[in-house]
Amino acid sequence: YDFRTVNAGAWSCDTVCEFISKGGRNSSLIPYEKGKPVNPSRIKEIEMRSLDSFVKDERITYIKYDVEGSESEALDGSKTVIKRDKPKLLVSLYHRTEDMFALPIKVTELNPSYKLYLRQHPYIPAWDMNLYCI
């Protein structure tokens, strides 16, 4: 298999976001923490990339989106690839309540030819729900 890792976050466009590094599940992007006091030493600038800008004309066959609540933004940054290549997708739906409904609709709008499957695997924690797009 041909794959590579990139030291960047998945997003809708190429940018830099401020991230609060608290460790584990308490880490987040700054906009989701407005109004709460933040230790400046925990703020990190993170390079964010859209998949479309990164892969250009490469053919993509599989994408896994498990980006801790930023799945919608990551899908927005992959519109061209999804329309052009119809890669198989695995999209996490459990980070934000609205994603259970909004993300299947978004995927179908990007490429109506997908068949969608919801699966809840026996993971710990037990609320992990995934959308498979074939």
Segments the model singles out, each with a brief description of its role:
Residues 1-134:
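Phosphate/nucleotide-binding beta-alpha loop and adjacent structural elements of enzyme active sites
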